[in-house]
């Protein structure tokens, strides 16, 4: 029960419950835009099949949760917690992931660059640490660069589709998907290539200031 409530609060803060039905977000680029680093086939399957499945299953789980609440069915409410966490986390994680990638690449600057240099010594050090920790994930999961309320940056990994903020309290800035569907068709079992690709900056176009503002907007939306 507590897990279901905790996930609901996190989802609200992320702005995902500002609409009744979750939908698959459009990509800000074509499926082939990231080639040759990430193939169009992988992007199409990853987005339109895998992410769509998380969205569909999350909607089903939330419908069942609403019905269970109306009936006061505590047993069913508790039993839905794993599905909400897994599919809700998959939706949150992938929605962030697509925005982290850019055909044009880009390097951190301004407030984000200053924070990286402060907490890791350099962008290269941060990349190496993020790569090493993410490669070490056993099975499926994610590697993240996130920040805490005080503004310090941290690297963390999460298993399966566990969402970063609900699991660690860190606000996600940049995520790396190391589920096999994210790379296996193209790179087989060579995970490291996907973590430090030659054609796309590890940081993409993210900025600390922009991510903080998005978090504030999501909180305002959930309270409306």
Swiss-Prot record:
GO terms for cellular component: mitochondrial matrix. It is found in: Mitochondrion matrix. Transmembrane segments: none annotated. GO terms for molecular function: manganese ion binding; superoxide dismutase activity. It is an enzyme of class 1 (oxidoreductase). It catalyses: 2 superoxide + 2 H(+) = H2O2 + O2. Its main location: mitochondrion. Keywords: Manganese, Metal-binding, Mitochondrion, Oxidoreductase, Transit peptide. Residues 1-20 form a transit peptide. Belongs to the iron/manganese superoxide dismutase family. Destroys superoxide anion radicals which are normally produced within the cells and which are toxic to biological systems. Homotetramer. This is Superoxide dismutase [Mn], mitochondrial. It comes from Charybdis feriata (Crucifix crab).
